[in-house]
Amino acid sequence: MGVFDIFKKGADMPKTAQQRKDESIKILKKEGVVVFESLPLRYDNSEVTPRSVDEIITRAICSFTAIMCACTIRDNGHLSEDEIAWAKDFLGDFYGDLSVKEKEVVEGRADINLAVNMGWKYESLWILLWALGIAKDIGEMDKICDCEFVMNVF
């Protein structure tokens, strides 16, 4: 089982946090990644809530919009009023689902550091699109995601 296979339909999630950790360590070692086995377990199954398709779609829309605004801020130093209006219009009812930092970016209040960091959300958006079955192959995670593909989805 791959690290993200729990999102695929029909995949069985290991029963315990320890089983998940052991499986992840096995995969990482197979890939030649140095592993610190002494790190504590992150979450027990009782603390994990799988997200619904609607929640994943909402997160993808919010992430995409924040990324577009962040890249504009990074490249131009700011968002114009028209660009802010576009973002809010594109989001529609999803505007209220933005995180605090996403809202800062979409409203044009982000500094260059936040904008650059927000641009890296492409990687998490890539995983969301894979979880939705839109991106068919996310690769080995050793390269930057296919940003053009991500943009064309929206």
Say what each PLM segment does:
Residues 3-154:
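Extended, charge-rich alpha-helical interface modules
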